[in-house]
Amino acid sequence: VNSAGPSGGEANGTDATAAPDATAAPTATADAGAGAKAPTIAAVLPGGGARGAYEVGALSELLPALEARGERVSVWCGTSVGAINAVAFGSRAHLSAGEQTELARALWLSMRKHDVIARIVGIGGVRTMARAVGNIVGTPGAGVASLLDPSPLAASLDRWIDWDRLDANVQARLVQACVIATSLTSGEPFAFVASADGPPRLYDDEVRYVGTRLSGEHVRASAAIPVLFPAVEVTHPRRAAGYYADGGTRLNSPIKPALNLGADRVIVIGLEPFSFGGGRPASPRGPSIADVAANMLDGMLVDQVAQDVRRMALVNSFFVEDVATGTLHSPRSYRLSRGHDPYRPISYALVSPRRHGEIGRIAQQVFQRRYGGFGSLRDIDYTVISRILGSSSQSRGELLSFLMFDQEFVAELIELGRRDAQRWLRRHPRFWCRDASHDLNVGDVDRGVLKEQDALEEFRQRRR
């Protein structure tokens, strides 16, 4: 149960079955009129390596449209590459929406692979690969924890992000920023929160909130995809010191931190469609290493976001009801009868590609144009990665899209994000929506559907 509201009923278990977590929050102003405070708007940005360019493209359309309505994003929550985008936008919260998005676009178009990972083909890269294989087969003294070396990212983040400006914007209450990473000591997701009010003061059995001044180590920890990149040591604050990996590995409800930071409305950028159905076509042969790896990465970085969006939409369908026709047994009447504020639906804006695997197809096309044939001389690393993944693999493009920090690929993703955001704005002239069936192909739901959601969540918690 999300206990982002001011009352503490959910935290002490008095109303533990009122709603699934991360989907709705009790509020004293649920039915407020003209005197209500301005809504707090959050952006939730998932992980995906070079796919983060898509997020920038979508935001380049959404943020100016939001500003034209007199609204701005004041809560940025990110995981993995979404954490990089979150702190980048947070550090520019003092600028106009147009300036923010133009700087973000310029940053992404300037990124290169060597800004993020060390060369694969070369003495250092061969040594890293050899030590990784040694670890797998149990060679004594192998001593490496990843296939790739992301050491260049530390210096790059300090070039890309003005950490002092981010902190100044936080202290001026222009923005709250939240970076998610997974503790390798406890297995829990940690939300490193930069907020003038400190972290959320509530009980949460899924996410631990830690107030801090954000720095490169928090972002690198959030982006440490297991196996690909090594775990990152976080040294501050001391009470949360330890080694961390990618924040998407254990976070079942990516939207939840944004709501617990006070968000009334959320923008969620997805890297695969949010709607039900679709997916990769079945392969007539057995799965390749690329197929397996792509499914693993989707499970960590994509599926949880889509599931949480669907859960939010289902709960919106359940809790949006006509006050005049509500019955004694309705969720609204039930909560009021227990002395709690009524739940409210969460308005949202959702942007994602129209088709499953669209970003992977673009990566494959760009790779063929840029690095096929004699083009392999541009960057032999991409050719080596492609050979390892297999030239006939349907999932090769999916995996390349995580690592292809190529200007042409980045430009195409920015443009795709722009088009998909424009599509959302055409369908939603008032920007926000809360109709599940309209956006996710979800029909009307009843209590039985939500009971199944609760049972699934209970199973998840027991399994953890």
Residue ranges of predicted features:
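Active-site gating loop/helix substructures
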Residues: 171-301, 386, 395-402
